[in-house]
């Protein structure tokens, strides 16, 4: 009740309580005994008993109370019929159920009851009086100690004025009967004593009594255990502490609890006093001859007084029984137990020797006594004073108690406290031993063979004597010598041996405690070292290779980080709320970095985290292998992993992502392999726990299924089970709009994280700056993209702004606001294929080279053609169109004009605006009316005209107006001009994450046996996806005879001619570390795109002729199909050359042609553009 707030206590006091008469009312004999004894009551009673103060004038009510009549305790309040009868003592039932007597006039009692005080006697029903002043006093003084008597509060609240008439009462006052007993109506008691009677309680007396009660309550509370951290740990709860307080109250008067505040401060005082005594007394006895000084006597007298008081308090202090952790509070048991344990030692150490000497000196004042004391009693007094050193036992007991207090209250390591105590005890023993080394020779009057006489230190100062004595004692105790010299006398020899024994014992104890302390400070690291020693012995026993041993060592370092502990057993011993709190704290970074958890229900996150298991993987470890049965899914806390498929498609996942959930959802086999690229710290979730959690949260199951479908779509795979589930959920309307938005947000976050992981893992090549959107776009569908970008960098009339990175936060920002990563992935051109067994690519050390000189590109079956290139390909039955000679050099560039020119000229990107403005400068003549639209930018990249001294007729460019709509296609039936110069053509290629199979067929010769022009041999490729086909960059046909030469093109003054080989040299700078191609064949090129894992491009491979007319091994009309390799190491890349340089199309060389090869009667498939509109 002491710790309850005032409002709560007021509510408790105001509650009506129906308490039985036997519980709270004394019988008549007890009442008589109480009044006869002056109001004393049993201290073991817990109810608040209040007695009235004696009235100044004799009152019949007091006599009636002494007689013990029942009417004087509980009769209803009544008065005489005429209103002026004398008042008698009336009993009133207070709101807390206690019976308190009130004295006063009828008017005052009636006013407290809320009614009048006169009239006839009437029986009162059982009601309750409501007096705010009385309630406030009851609350203030309700917590009385068991043995105190107090005046009932509220009596002197309203003193009556003498002679004041009683106000008339409308009805008789209804006073509740005594403590719940219903009195009959005729049990009226005559009330005597009017208003003039001076029987009111004075406020001063009440204040004095209240102050005395307050001090007694405060001092009583000091003897009880307080509600603090130490007591709560000892007893378990605040309720148990309150029960212990009640035990102290009921145990008797002046019983001190061992965990009370008073005992705490008393023990602290005695601890300091004992330390002072144990240090000062040996020095005073040994080195000071005059012991009659005032400071010395005062110190001894005060010390003896405190120790005597402590001896008395030990008889009233509870004793803690260490066997059953019970506390003895019975005074008789405390006395018997203390007499049997430490009483004798404490009494001997507390004998007041100085008190005895002072009493004797005051009574016997003679010179004979003083001389006798100085000569004979001095040795006895010194030896008797040594008994005070037995107080060391109290010091040890108090220190042991304080060790427990520090260990339980402040969580200090008990080993540290023990080390400090051990050091203090060693220093104290050294101090005593030093004093003893000087005291023994002094008691012998310094013989000649003692160390003091040999060193001539008899008459030196006490400081010098103490220093040499302490040095001699510590030399003995540490066993390092005998001091300045070896002992000579017999007493010195025995003292030296005693010092050695004590010192060796203390030294051994110190070493043992120090070792335990060091081991306990870092036990987890010691366990790790012991465990790793076992691992090393295991590796040595099995003779594991050094690289495996190093991997095992690295694994242990990253997994345990030098500390080993059983985390599962630790968490299993904790309560469930504490376990969840610790797991949430350990996985806070995982939750913060994972969009799946950030948008999920907190209960789902907690349920998922409590079932996770921590694992560590090294770089190169396959966490999941394709085709195996999945039993776990993984959440990435730190690290980067690669998701690999059989098509060699790779996806990066980084911190905050997860994988392996597809087989857990479909109960099938793994659809991809996952390899760790760095050290990965993962959390795994078993399939049973996964399904258990998702059964409770169906919305999160739909999110997992949707993300799994999106990931399968990104790697080119499908799953009918997941697709059916998702479509069923969407059609049935299970989820609402908010849940669908959360699922879409989770899918979008997963795509962005995969894109960021690819960017983080990509290495930036050392190359000249090129147009960033062309490189960082997730789509590089043509080999000429690299050539166009390089041409952009060398064009002198383009502004420098286009060579800077786009201003958006991400690379995808330059691709258009409406294009999401999903749309871009669906627009990518992919063509995975397997290399031929006969191809040189089967050997990793050999380059992949084509075996034909004149190659022809054809699409594979089932693959659609980009829309931008659809107009370049004639149908199966149409003859090829003739190509003018003037446009032959720009044939390769014309393909890109058709595919990209329109979108470049019509793009709204801010980066392309200066390009369009620069395309139409005032120095250029306007294009003819028949020129196709969209050539403002690309016309600057045409080679210089025939007037250049380093250019040939095959390298001439022409204005936009002279470019035919067919982009190098002439009238049908025109024969093709054969090549005349046997010069090798340069070779340009573009690369991305994958390579597409390209079918090349030479023109102009008969096919060899086993081959036909209509059905060229192709290698197998992956089936097309629903989201898009794998297309190839096709070159326009050039098999028809050349048309008559057109008129020469006018010279363009605004565009300076490019230097010979300039673009080729610049391309060589980009990949200078790549070796040259072999002379007998061309090598395919594949370079991994740093920003896209799914986009693929095709290299346009020009022929490498060996003879002027025909390449060796290839006849007219022979078709040769080549497959670009999947991977090409950095050492197998050819030196890149430009298609548009001076050596791009030499006169007389074989012309690179391309035409779609279809079977007879095959219908042309509709083509769709796979290029983004703003590229």
From Swiss-Prot:
Listed SMART domains: cNMP (SM00100)
Location in or out of the cell: Cell membrane
Lineage: Eukaryota, Metazoa, Chordata, Craniata, Vertebrata
Residue spans crossing the bilayer: 260-288, 293-316, 330-352, 375-410, 414-444, 489-521
Biased composition (Low complexity): 60-75, 839-854, 900-912, 948-966, 984-1004
Disulphide bridges, residue numbers: none
Known catalytic reactions: K(+)(in) = K(+)(out); Na(+)(in) = Na(+)(out)
Protein name stated in the entry: Potassium/sodium hyperpolarization-activated cyclic nucleotide-gated channel 4
Annotated positions binding 3',5'-cyclic GMP: 560, 563, 565, 567
Gene: HCN4
Binding-site residues, 3',5'-cyclic AMP: 660-661, 663, 670-671, 674, 711
Gene Ontology biological process terms in this record: cellular response to cAMP; potassium ion transmembrane transport; regulation of heart rate; regulation of membrane depolarization; sodium ion transmembrane transport
Ranges of biased composition (kind: Gly residues): 111-126
This protein's UniProt keywords: cAMP, cAMP-binding, Cell membrane, Ion channel, Ion transport, Ligand-gated ion channel, Membrane, Nucleotide-binding, Phosphoprotein, Potassium, Potassium channel, Potassium transport, Sodium, Sodium channel, Sodium transport, Transmembrane, Transmembrane helix, Transport, Voltage-gated channel
Result of altering residue 553 to A: Reduces response to cAMP
Ranges of compositional bias, category Acidic residues: 26-36
GO cellular component assignments: axon; dendrite; HCN channel complex; plasma membrane
Region named Disordered: 17-186, 801-820, 830-1175
Post-translational modification: S-palmitoylated.
């Amino acid at each position: 009740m002491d710790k309850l707030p005032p409002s709560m206590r007021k509510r408790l006091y105001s509650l009506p309580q129906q308490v039985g008469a036997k519980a709270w009312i004394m019988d008549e004999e007890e009442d008589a005994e109480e009044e006869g004894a002056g109001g004393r009551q049993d201290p073991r009673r817990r109810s608040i008993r209040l007695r009235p103060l004696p009235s100044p004038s004799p009152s019949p009510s007091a006599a009636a109370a002494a007689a013990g009549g029942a009417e004087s305790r509980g009769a209803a309040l009544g008065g005489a019929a005429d209103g002026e009868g004398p008042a008698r003592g009336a009993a009133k039932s207070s709101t807390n159920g206690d019976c308190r007597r009130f004295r006063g006039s009828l008017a005052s009692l009636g006013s407290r009851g809320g009614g009048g005080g006169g009239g006839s006697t009437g029986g009162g029903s059982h009601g309750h009086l409501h007096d705010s002043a009385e309630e406030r006093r009851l609350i203030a003084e309700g917590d009385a100690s068991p043995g105190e008597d107090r005046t009932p509060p509220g009596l002197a609240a309203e003193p009556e004025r003498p002679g004041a008439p009683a106000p008339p009462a409308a009805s008789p006052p209804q006073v509740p009967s005594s403590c719940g007993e219903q009195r009959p109506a005729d049990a009226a008691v005559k009330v005597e004593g009017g208003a003039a009677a001076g029987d009111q309680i004075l406020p001063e007396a009440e204040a004095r009594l209240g102050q005395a009660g307050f001090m007694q309550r405060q001092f009583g509370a000091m003897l009880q255990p307080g509600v603090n951290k130490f007591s709560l740990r000892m007893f378990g709860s605040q309720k148990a502490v309150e029960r212990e307080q009640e035990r102290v109250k009921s145990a008797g008067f002046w019983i001190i609890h061992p965990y009370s505040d008073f005992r705490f401060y008393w023990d602290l005082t005695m601890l300091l006093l004992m330390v002072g005594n144990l240090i000062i007394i040996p020095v005073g006895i040994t080195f000071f001859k005059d012991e009659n000084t005032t400071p010395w006597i005062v110190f001894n007298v005060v010390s003896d007084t405190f120790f005597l008081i402590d001896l008395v308090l030990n008889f009233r202090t509870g004793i803690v029984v260490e066997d059953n952790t019970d506390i003895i509070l019975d005074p008789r048991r405390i006395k018997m137990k203390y007499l049997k344990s430490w009483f004798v030692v404490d009494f001997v150490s507390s004998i007041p020797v100085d008190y005895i000497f002072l009493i004797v000196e005051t009574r016997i004042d003679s010179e004979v006594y003083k001389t006798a004391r100085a000569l004979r009693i001095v040795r006895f007094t010194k030896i008797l004073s040594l008994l005070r050193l037995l107080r060391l036992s109290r010091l040890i007991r108090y220190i042991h108690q304080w060790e427990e207090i520090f260990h339980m209250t402040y969580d200090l390591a008990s080993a540290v406290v023990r080390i400090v105590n051990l050091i203090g005890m060693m220093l104290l023993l050294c101090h005593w031993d030093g004093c003893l080394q000087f005291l023994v020779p002094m008691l012998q009057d310094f013989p000649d063979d003692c160390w003091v006489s040999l060193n001539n230190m008899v008459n030196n100062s006490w400081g010098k004597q103490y220093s040499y004595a302490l040095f001699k004692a510590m030399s003995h105790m540490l066993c390092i010598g005998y001091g300045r010299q070896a002992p000579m006398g017999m007493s010195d020899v025995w003292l030296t041996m005693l010092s050695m024994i004590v010192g060796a014992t203390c030294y051994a104890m110190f070493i043992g405690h120090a070792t335990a302390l060091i081991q306990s400070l870092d036990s987890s690291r010691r366990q790790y070292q012991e465990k790793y020693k076992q691992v090393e012995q295991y590796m040595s026993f099995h003779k594991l290779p050094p690289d495996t041993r190093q991997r095992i060592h690295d694994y242990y370092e990253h997994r345990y980080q030098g500390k080993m502990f059983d985390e599962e057993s630790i968490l299993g011993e904790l309560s469930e709320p504490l376990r969840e709190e610790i797991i949430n704290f350990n996985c806070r970074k995982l939750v913060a970095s994972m969009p799946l958890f950030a948008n999920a229900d907190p209960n789902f996150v907690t349920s998922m985290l409590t079932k996770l298991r921590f694992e560590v993987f090294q770089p190169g470890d396959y966490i999941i292998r394709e085709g195996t049965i999945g039993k776990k899914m993984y959440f990435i806390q730190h690290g980067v992993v690669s998701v690999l498929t059989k098509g060699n498609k790779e996806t990066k996942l980084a911190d905050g992502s997860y994988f392996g959930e597809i087989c857990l959802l479909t109960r099938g086999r793994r659809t991809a392999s996952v390899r760790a690229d760095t050290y990965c710290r993962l959390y795994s979730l078993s399939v049973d726990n996964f399904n258990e959690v998702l059964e409770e949260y169906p919305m999160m199951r739909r999110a997992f299924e949707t993300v799994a479908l999106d990931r399968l779509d990104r790697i080119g795979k499908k799953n009918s089970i997941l697709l059916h589930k998702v479509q069923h959920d969407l059609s049935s309307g299970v989820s609402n709009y908010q849940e669908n938005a959360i699922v879409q947000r989770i899918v979008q976050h997963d795509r962005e994280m995969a894109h960021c992981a690819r960017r983080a893992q990509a290495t930036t090549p050392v190359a000249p700056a090129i147009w960033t959107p062309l490189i960082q776009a997730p789509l590089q569908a043509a080999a000429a993209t690299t050539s166009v970008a390089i041409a952009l960098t060398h064009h002198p009339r383009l502004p420098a702004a286009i060579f800077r990175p786009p201003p958006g936060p991400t690379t995808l920002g330059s691709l258009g606001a409406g294009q999401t990563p999903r749309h871009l992935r669906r627009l990518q051109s992919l063509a995975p294929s397997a290399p031929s067994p006969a191809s040189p690519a089967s050997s990793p050390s050999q380059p992949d080279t084509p075996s034909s000189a004149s190659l022809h590109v054809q699409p594979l079956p089932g693959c659609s053609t980009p829309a931008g290139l659809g107009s370049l390909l004639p149908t199966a039955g149409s003859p090829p169109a003739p190509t003018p000679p003037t446009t032959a050099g720009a044939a390769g560039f014309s393909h890109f004009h058709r595919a990209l020119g329109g979108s470049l000229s019509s793009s709204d990107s801010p980066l392309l605006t200066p390009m369009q403005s620069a395309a139409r400068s005032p120095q250029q003549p306007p294009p003819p009316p028949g020129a196709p639209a969209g050539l403002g930018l690309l016309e600057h990249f045409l080679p210089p005209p025939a007037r250049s001294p380093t250019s040939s007729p095959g390298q001439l460019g022409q204005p936009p107006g002279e470019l035919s709509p067919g982009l190098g296609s002439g009238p049908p039936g025109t024969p093709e001009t054969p090549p005349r110069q046997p010069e090798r053509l340069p070779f340009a290629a573009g690369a991305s994450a994958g390579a597409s199979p390209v079918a090349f067929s030479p023109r102009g010769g008969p096919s060899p046996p086993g081959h036909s022009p209509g059905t060229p041999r192709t290698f197998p490729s992956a089936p097309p996806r629903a989201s898009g086909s794998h297309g190839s960059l096709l070159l326009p046909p050039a098999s028809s005879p050349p048309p008559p030469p057109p008129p020469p093109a006018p010279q363009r003054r605004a565009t300076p001619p490019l230097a010979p080989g300039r673009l080729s040299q610049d391309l060589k700078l980009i990949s200078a570390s790549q070796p040259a191609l072999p002379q007998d064949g061309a090598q395919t090129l594949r370079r991994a795109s740093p920003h896209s894992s799914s986009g693929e491009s095709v290299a346009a491979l020009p022929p490498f002729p060996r003879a002027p007319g025909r390449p060796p091994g290839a006849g007219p009309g022979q078709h040769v199909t080549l497959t670009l390799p999947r991977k090409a190491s950095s050492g197998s890349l050819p030196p890149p050359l430009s298609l548009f340089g001076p050596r791009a199309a030499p006169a007389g060389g074989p012309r690179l042609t391309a035409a779609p090869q279809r079977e007879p009667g095959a219908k042309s498939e509709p083509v769709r553009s796979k290029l983004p509109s703003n590229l």
